[in-house]
């Protein structure tokens, strides 16, 4: 009996888990090989010996060629003279990032060379956004060392404009969400930076517990880059009130946490205080992490926060946060004036506490209208494999472990890192893409998640080309009210489907679909039929709040 089975049996005996989950649930099928995904992640060496190598990478779904099908981008590591052992020198220059084009038939084609996006740096996170409002998604790659920014040429190729744009941040960057922080109509980018790795410090440190952790090194400040509207960006971090010289950001999340229509920043740091920067609406932010209960773990300790997932877990109209870590994880429920840690009472701690969590996801995998939890797991200091977690939200405030019922994949073990979701086969349910350390990522097709009714909302700015990043969708069907912010950068170093997915259960239509645009004007649609991708374009006559 595995650890998961033993713990689950114990939990059942002491009645911590509610009534058994119905057996007719969706399953996930590992289609990696059949889909043609063969790019293996590498940390650029033959032995895992330091934190640069062990941090891993994320993964991204995005439609780079505007054909309506989600493509895949995978950052990779490299052999680095300041990081890697000399034994790995033969890998130098041989490792690249990979772009897979979705063929629309369940398979993907490697188009990295044709698209000219095969960066050879030490890659971690990636994100895509239409920074120049020309209708196609541009690509930003976070590296250990200079970051890379590719402008989409609209013909299937990209051009490296890193230096000219001012976005070649030379620090150790992990994540980069895009949003219009100042309301001027173009997208800015927040770059989450990690720590100042010292290649000579602890170089020969090989304790049984593994290489030194993040607190052995100095932190690095993050950066907010303002889009100047001319193809260049300016660092406005200090002026915006965001400068924290000793942060150790593992990722960055943008969402509206206080329902004022402005996008805030939540920054999970590694082993120290986390930041919640509330948007003041005047181009400035203030850190209220401590006041809101977001700075530390339930015991007042700094936790090894990985990639946070955001969503309205209890359907009360306020965005909650789930943060995986090396312990039990943290489910932080938004109580308007503060956040309450409900990890233990929801059953998440019992299951997630067995593993080291990295890529956390809140998504409605079964289409019943309630957000479920997926976590990609893997040891932080060794290549020890772990099972991933899938917990179903039963709608009563409890999560039920359904992993072993959800397909053979969940009986296997990997060294998981980033994870994301998206409907890559356009069948109405959410599929998974899981990045693994020093291994091939796994593409997991959701089979049966569309048995319930669903609605996918594709939000566009005037003209219908660019995604309306930062908009909020509220879908009402009967007594169930769901909200979602259109921010595709989510979880650990990853980006997912930019469309907002809503499970409607047995409802054949949504009573209302309300869109609050980034400028806080609104559009309301009524009696919207289920089982469709609804494209909503911002009209000039949208009603102002």
Predicted segments with their positions:
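Gly/Ser/Thr/Pro-enriched helix-cap/hinge segments flanking short amphipathic alpha-helices
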Residues: 23-27, 45, 346, 350, ...
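Blade-edge beta-strand/turn elements of extracellular beta-propeller
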Residues: 28-31, 107-116, 157-167, 231-243, ...
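Repeat-based blade/solenoid architectures
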Residues: 37-58, 93, 115-127, 166-177, ...
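Beta-propeller blade termini
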Residues: 56-66, 101, 122-133, 137, ...
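Hydrophobic beta-strand segments that make up the repeating blades of beta-propeller
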Residues: 72-76, 134-143, 189-193, 264-269, ...
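Short, conserved, GDST-rich strand-edge loop motifs in beta-rich repeat architectures
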Residues: 75-92, 193-217, 374-384
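Beta-propeller blade signature
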Residues: 95-102, 220-227, 278, 388-394
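Asp-box/WD-like beta-propeller blade repeats and closely related beta-sheet repeat scaffolds
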Residues: 111-131, 141-181, 191-215, 219-221, ...
């Amino acid at each position: 009996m595995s650890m998961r089975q033993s713990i689950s049996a114990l939990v059942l005996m002491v009645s911590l888990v509610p009534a058994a989950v119905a057996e007719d649930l969706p399953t996930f099928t590992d289609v990696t090989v059949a889909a043609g995904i063969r790019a293996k992640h590498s940390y650029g060496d033959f032995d895992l010996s330091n934190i640069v190598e062990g941090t891993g990478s994320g993964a991204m779904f995005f439609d780079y060629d505007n054909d309506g099908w989600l493509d895949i981008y995978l950052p990779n590591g490299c052999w680095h003279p300041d990081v890697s052992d000399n034994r790995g020198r033969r890998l130098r220059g041989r490792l690249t990032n990979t772009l897979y084009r979705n063929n629309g038939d369940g398979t993907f084609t490697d188009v990295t060379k044709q698209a000219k996006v095969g960066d050879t740096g030490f890659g971690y996170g990636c994100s895509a956004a239409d920074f120049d409002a020309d209708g196609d998604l541009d690509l930003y790659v976070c590296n250990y060392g200079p970051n890379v920014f590719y402008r989409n040429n609209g013909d299937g190729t990209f051009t490296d404009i890193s230096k000219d744009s001012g976005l070649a941040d030379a620090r150790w960057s992990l994540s980069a969400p895009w949003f219009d922080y100042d309301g001027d109509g173009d997208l800015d980018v927040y770059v989450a930076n990690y720590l100042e790795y010292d290649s000579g410090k602890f170089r020969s440190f090989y304790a049984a517990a593994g290489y030194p952790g993040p607190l052995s090194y100095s932190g690095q400040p993050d950066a907010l880059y303002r889009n100047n509207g001319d193809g260049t960006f300016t660092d406005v971090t200090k002026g915006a009130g965001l400068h924290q010289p000793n942060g150790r950001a593992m990722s960055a999340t943008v969402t509206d946490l206080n329902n004022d229509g402005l996008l805030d920043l939540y920054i999970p740091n590694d082993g120290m205080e986390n930041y919640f920067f509330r948007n003041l609406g005047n181009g400035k932010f203030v850190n209220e992490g401590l006041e809101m209960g977001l700075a530390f773990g339930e015991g007042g300790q700094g936790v090894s926060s990985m990639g946070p997932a955001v969503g309205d877990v209890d359907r009360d109209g306020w965005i909650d946060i789930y943060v995986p870590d090396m312990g039990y994880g943290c489910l932080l429920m938004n109580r308007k004036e503060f956040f309450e840690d409900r990890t233990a009472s929801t059953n998440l701690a019992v299951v997630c506490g067995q593993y080291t969590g990295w890529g956390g996801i809140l998504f409605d995998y079964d289409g019943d209208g309630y957000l479920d939890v997926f976590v990609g797991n893997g040891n932080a200091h060794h290549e020890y494999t772990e099972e991933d977690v899938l917990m179903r939200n039963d709608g009563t405030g409890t999560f039920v472990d359904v992993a072993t019922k959800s397909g053979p994949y969940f009986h296997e073990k990997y060294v998981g890192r980033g994870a994301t979701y998206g409907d890559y086969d356009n069948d109405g349910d959410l599929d998974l893409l899981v990045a693994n350390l020093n291994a091939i990522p796994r593409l997991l097709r959701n089979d049966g998640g569309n048995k319930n009714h669903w609605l996918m909302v594709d939000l566009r700015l005037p003209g219908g080309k660019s995604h309306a990043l930062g908009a909020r969708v509220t879908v009402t069907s009967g007594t169930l009210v769901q909200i979602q912010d259109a921010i595709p950068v989510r979880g650990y170093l990853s980006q997912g489907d930019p469309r907002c997915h809503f499970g409607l259960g047995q409802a054949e239509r949504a009573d209302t679909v309300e869109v609050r645009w980034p400028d806080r004007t609104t559009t309301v649609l009524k009696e919207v039929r289920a089982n469709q991708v609804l494209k909503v374009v911002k009209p000039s006559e949208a009603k102002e709040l």
